[in-house]
Amino acid sequence: MPSANLHPIVLTGVIGLMLLIRLRCTFTSTFSLPPLVTLNQIIALSFCGLLLNSISRAERACYYNYSVDSSKQQHISISTPNGK
């Protein structure tokens, strides 16, 4: 099932394609092939996509606790979705 917000996924794909296209790549012949994508590039782009997707789905919650002596404590928790 696709996520509710596809913008980070599309952005990751566009950035990945821009990184894979090299400006120095000039084809000397009509039949020359583009440079192959290496396994390191695939792993790096997959990790970046996973990281961006996790960041975009994280929920931030701030809790303020007041004590008797009027001091303020702040508790910040960042939770990720449970996959539902």
Curated annotation (Swiss-Prot):
Membrane topology designation: Multi-pass membrane protein
Cellular compartments annotated: Host endoplasmic reticulum membrane
Protein name (record): Double gene block protein 2
Family: Belongs to the carmovirus double gene block protein 2 family.
Regions of this protein lying in the Cytoplasmic compartment: 26-30
Domain of life: Viruses
Gene Ontology cellular component list: host cell endoplasmic reticulum membrane; membrane
GO BP annotations, alphabetical order: transport of virus in host, cell to cell
